[in-house]
């Protein structure tokens, strides 16, 4: 990362440069060394993008919000899609990503949230709407995380759906949908013994599929 942060006040910061996109969800916030494998949306996401952001911590010490305006691309439209670019779709003149995030803490820190909404101007007439709802429940020796993620893509940025349907449709899928659930449970048996369970699922679909049974 290469960015500059300016403290506008004790609780408000402005950052610009190459930023970590504030996608939301606890899976994304974990140190990669603590993740055996990521669910598909995070695995295929471009997490470090050029742009600017502002964040604010509220006086109650329990809530914070952030807003980012980012260049949604780490490579050109041609490099991203190549020959799979649909002939009816033109690249966006301003490929921007708008990201809003809210973090909250309730019940003396027993319940925490990191919720976000992101809008991508992926191409002309093809946008992406991404929701991430991260929840954390904490007891004495037990922590439970649950993330719900929903990515509605006017043009299949991740390419998973496109690779599945490539035999019947040679271009990047339009109107692809990704819906995911991620659960992580941690139980501290003893000071040096921590049990960990991670369960996840990922559903991909092509809303433009001409086969109603497909």
Cite the ranges covered by each PLM segment:
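Outer membrane beta-barrel
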Residues: 1-74, 104-107
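Short intrinsically disordered, low-complexity coil segments enriched in acidic
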Residues: 2-7, 197, 213-214
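Outer-membrane beta-barrel and related beta-rich outer-membrane complex signature
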Residues: 26-30, 77-81, 156-160, 209-211
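A short secondary-structure junction signal
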Residues: 27-28, 66-68, 76-81, 114-115, ...
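Extracellular loop and loop/strand-boundary signature of outer-membrane beta-barrel proteins
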Residues: 35-40, 81-88, 120, 166-171, ...
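Outer-membrane beta-barrel initiation region
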Residues: 66, 91-93
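Solenoidal tandem-repeat scaffolds enriched in leucines and small polar residues
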Residues: 74-77, 81-89, 96, 104-106, ...
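Detector for outer-membrane/organellar transmembrane beta-barrel domains
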Residues: 95, 100-209
